[in-house]
Amino acid sequence: MNNRRKVLAVVVALVALSAGVLSYIVLTTPSSSPHAPGSPSGCPASVTPGVVTSTSGNVTAGNWTTYHGNTSRSGFLPMANVTGVHAQWAGPVGLDGQVYAEPLTCGNAVFVATEGDSIYAVNVSNGNVLWKTNLGSPVPGSALPCGDINPSGITGTPAIDVATGTIYAVAFLSPGQHVLFGLSIKNGSVLSRVVVDAAGANPLVEQQRGALLLDNGVVYIPYGGLDGDCGQYHGWVVGARTNGSGSLLSYPVPTGREGGIWGTAGVALGPNGNLYVATGNSEATTTFDYGDAVIELSPSLAVLDYFAPTNWAQLNSGDIDLGSVAPTIMPNGDVFQIGKEGVGYLLSGSHLGGIGGQLFDESICGGGYGGTARVGQSILVPCDDSLVKVVVGTSSFSVAWKASGFDAGSPIVTGDIVWAVNISTSDLVGFNLSTGQPVYSFALGSVDHFITPSAAPGVLFVGAGSQLYSFVLE
């Protein structure tokens, strides 16, 4: 790859959309699937057959059915090296809210969730809306004691069960209730609906920002607090069975207050079948209470292990969240963690280490935010001052390159190109995976915090404000 920089201002045409509001009825719940999202089987060749017409021979439908493409959140799409990129379409203008969630793909459709509490299925090839389902009225910012999203609707990235053809999303509904919906990916019809606020939680101060994890017939849902840390909130993980059986599973972070699980990658699944989350600061400074920690949970949400830095009390008192980035799962089960302090920690998958028991640690950047991407032993780390490539060995890691002066959104990798949005400039930038040199750049509209692209074979998607952009990879 040469170091050319391609700048494109994407011009969009207005598309008028009509919106319908669905009534809240408990409908038949789809059968449970033992398969985690990400399997290539089960995605239909066409959503709403007869409506879709392909206009580009360069785009092949593919499946990116959960945050960063798989349950370990690697964010890597293997493909031939990228030799060129061009904008395919931008639209549909008229999305009824901002896009914080990562777009997902299945079959010929890309699925977009909005803060207007709607899910859209959009044709991968031409950007036409295949269907739209509105799930209710979002919660206005004026109804919340603090926060920076207005209105608040669907914030966490949904998950698709390809075996049942169902997309699951948590909608925050006015006047203040979190509801897990299951929708048919074929036509957007509502298949299931369940309230997923944990017993004793106050929905008005619990934010569902982290990505959903679907595994073995359970949707795992992380919660943190609102921007401003107002109210008596705790971090939670709630589990809802897709077949509707039993009561909700739940794990409350045992803090006096705070300790939110708010990293956008949400819950990660390890090769051992256990779940990994990272928490933000709590108010504790004398007795450890699982604030600023990495926690390993069983599928039934029992605590199995944990790690916290030796300076956890200082991190707590300074609002220096370890959980500003979700855990990165290595192929052998080891865990990499970084937070606002910018210090990376390598943890053993067989024993996370308790307080101060890391295998290795080193300062990497000014502060990590969002979700990482991983290609083999290499991790791409989003920081507020740089995008950093870290290479992990058996018991340590080292920095391979650092793209400084880049306010990095959560990266993904397609072939030999690392893609990330510069949050400060609203540019989508492609970096050479080996060297860290910028190769491509595209100007977007305004973007939201922690935004991340998604990919399918030959195509890249990114949400910006209330817009979806598509790029063809050659």
What spans do the regions from the language model cover?
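Noncatalytic, solvent-exposed loop/strand surfaces
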Residues: 25-474
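Secretory targeting signatures
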Residues: 1-33
